[in-house]
C-alpha cells in the first residue's frame, strides 16, 4: 500500500475479514461486491473504495476471490501474531472483558490484569490473578504486552494511561470517553457508549420522522 489508508477504511477491515472468514468456513470461494454489501450492510461503493486502498483485489464481472481476500486482510491486520494484552481496571466492565477474553479471536489474548482496589487485588477472574498497578511495568516486560485496555473511569483515566505509557505500551483501548494526553508515538482508541447510543437514537428518530405518514 503506497498511500496511507484512511482511518475509516482501516476501522472497517476487521469487519470485512470477519465476514470473509464466515464465507470461507461456508465453502464460498467467490463473491461480488453487491452480494458482500448486502451481507455486511455496507454500500458496495464503499467496499470497492476501501479495497482500492489495499490493491487490485477483484476483477470486473468476476468479483472477489474469498480465500485470497482472507489472506490479504489477515496479513494487513497481522492476525497470525499473538497480541498480548494488559487489562487495567477490574470493575464490572473489566470482569466482563476478562471472562470473554476475545474467544472469537485466537490472536488477541488478555494475559494480565491490574487494579488499585485492595479488595480486587489478589482475586482471580477467569483464571487471571489481579495485580496491583505498581506491578504493571514489570509485567509488561515479563509477558511481552504490546496492547492495553483501560476501563478506568474518566476522572482517574489520565493517571492510569500515564502508567500504561510509562510501562512502554503504545497501543491503548480506552473505555473512558474523555480524551487523554499521550506522547505522539502512542495510539489511543476510545470506546464511548453514550455517544454511540445518542447517535443511534438520532438516526432512528430521524428515520422515523422521514417515513411517518404525512398529515
From Swiss-Prot:
Q: Which Gene Ontology biological process is one annotated for this entry?
A: response to redox state
The keyword Phosphoprotein belongs to this UniProt entry's keyword annotation? no
Q: Which UniProt keywords apply?
A: Cytoplasm, DNA-binding, NAD, Repressor, Transcription, Transcription regulation
GO cellular component terms attached to this protein's record? cytoplasm
Recorded hits in SUPFAM superfamilies, A to Z, give:
NAD(P)-binding Rossmann-fold domains (SSF51735), Winged helix' DNA-binding domain (SSF46785)
- DNA-binding region positions on the chain: 15-54
Pfam families named in the record: CoA_binding (PF02629), Put_DNA-bind_N (PF06971)
Q: Where in the cell is it found?
A: Cytoplasm
Q: Where does NAD(+) bind?
A: 89-94
GO MF annotations, alphabetized? DNA binding; DNA-binding transcription factor activity
Which cysteines are disulphide-bonded?
A: none
Q: What is its main location?
A: cytoplasm
Could you tell me which InterPro entries the record lists for this protein? CoA-bd (IPR003781), NAD(P)-bd_dom_sf (IPR036291), Rex_DNA-bd_C_dom (IPR009718), Tscrpt_rep_Rex (IPR022876), WH-like_DNA-bd_sf (IPR036388), WH_DNA-bd_sf (IPR036390)
Record bears the keyword Lipid metabolism: no
Q: Describe the family membership recorded for this protein in Swiss-Prot or TrEMBL.
A: Belongs to the transcriptional regulatory Rex family.
**What does the UniProt function comment say about this protein?**
Modulates transcription in response to changes in cellular NADH/NAD(+) redox state.
Q: How does it assemble?
A: Homodimer.
Q: What is the official name of this protein in its record?
A: Redox-sensing transcriptional repressor Rex 2
Organism name: Enterococcus faecalis (strain ATCC 700802 / V583)
Quick one: which gene encodes this? rex2
Amino acid at each position: 500500500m503506497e498511500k496511507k489508508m484512511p482511518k475509516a477504511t482501516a476501522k472497517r477491515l476487521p469487519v470485512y475479514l470477519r465476514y470473509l472468514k464466515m464465507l470461507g468456513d461456508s465453502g464460498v470461494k467467490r463473491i461480488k461486491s453487491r452480494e458482500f454489501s448486502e451481507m455486511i450492510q455496507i454500500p458496495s461503493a464503499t467496499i470497492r473504495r476501501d479495497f482500492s486502498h489495499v490493491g487490485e483485489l477483484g476483477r470486473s464481472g468476476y468479483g472477489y476471490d474469498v480465500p485470497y481476500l482472507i489472506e490479504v486482510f489477515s496479513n494487513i491486520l497481522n492476525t497470525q501474531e499473538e497480541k498480548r494484552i494488559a487489562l487495567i481496571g477490574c470493575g464490572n466492565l473489566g470482569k466482563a472483558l476478562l471472562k470473554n477474553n476475545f474467544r472469537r479471536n485466537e490472536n488477541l489474548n488478555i494475559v494480565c490484569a491490574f487494579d488499585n482496589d485492595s479488595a480486587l487485588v489478589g482475586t482471580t477472574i477467569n483464571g487471571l490473578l489481579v495485580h496491583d498497578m505498581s506491578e504493571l511495568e514489570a509485567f509488561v516486560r515479563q509477558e511481552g504486552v504490546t496492547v492495553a485496555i483501560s476501563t478506568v473511569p474518566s476522572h482517574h483515566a489520565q493517571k492510569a494511561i500515564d502508567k500504561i505509557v510509562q510501562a512502554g505500551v503504545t497501543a491503548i483501548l480506552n473505555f473512558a470517553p474523555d480524551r487523554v494526553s499521550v506522547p505522539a508515538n502512542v495510539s489511543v482508541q476510545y470506546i464511548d457508549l453514550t455517544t454511540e447510543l445518542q447517535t443511534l437514537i438520532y438516526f432512528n428518530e430521524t428515520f422515523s420522522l422521514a417515513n411517518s405518514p404525512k398529515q
